[in-house]
Amino acid sequence: MELPLHETVPSFVLRFTSDENDNKKILIPSVNTNRKRASALSLAQVRESAYGFGTALMSEDVVNRPWKKGEVMAFYSENQHDYLVAALGVMLAGGVPSLLSPMYKPEELNHAFELTRPRAILASVNTYEGAKNAATKFSQTGAGNVDVYVFDEEHERSMYTHLIDPGKKLRASGDMSLETVRINPTTDEAFYCFSSGTSGLPKAVRLSHSNMVTNTIQMTVTLGGRVNKPVYDP
């Protein structure tokens, strides 16, 4: 198989399939979620929301200034059905999601911040207070203000209220700022993932877009076997 080395994670994941598959609900909220307004998402909805998220990051209305390529958003949350939406949105804007364990203690969180220098944190309702305290502490080191957003539709710092919905409106009005972002899939980071820190503090692992696209194809083939229609067909 010839791997698509020209693909970024967003371009690969968000490619249009068919009307039937595009509108099928694929991301389902947990039955145990405490988010009252959480709803299942189709690929079309993931695409629209991710582009809204990324567009908002690059807008003049975002806190401080528009995001630049390579800037980092720390994800400090337990699993969420729309985790992928936010991660793709950050990548569309040229940013890098830094994926942190919601079990991190303050010293581990601060260490992760020192390694990746995040501009913003995306937390859950459960981790919000810890994220807010960590952001304040990190800002006091001279790192600048660290914005905090939340995976919740009703929270005062909701990523929907502050990023996705405003970004959708900008996109609908003709904002094409995301089309100016240039990413080299083989050299530019898609994610920072952290090791368990078994020996010492957690360590950041840099994964490129090509790394992630290749792994996605490998897992699709492994899990799908010869039963399902291939998701990727070069």
Predicted features by range, described:
Residues 92, 96-173, 179:
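Structural core segment of the AMP-binding/adenylate-forming
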Residues 45, 78-79, 104, 125-127, ...:
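Short beta->alpha linker loops
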Residues 40-43, 182, 190-217:
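Conserved AMP-binding A3 loop
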Residues 24-26, 156, 168-194, 201, ...:
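Conserved pre-ATP/AMP-binding loop-to-beta segment of ANL
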Residues 46-55, 205-234:
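Conserved structural elements of the adenylate-forming
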Residues 77-88, 103-107, 234:
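Conserved coil-to-alpha-helix start sites within the AMP-binding
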Residues 73, 90, 121, 189, ...:
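Conserved S/T- and glycine-rich ATP-binding loop of Class I adenylate-forming
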Residues 1-72, 88, 93, 114:
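N-lobe entry segment of adenylate-forming
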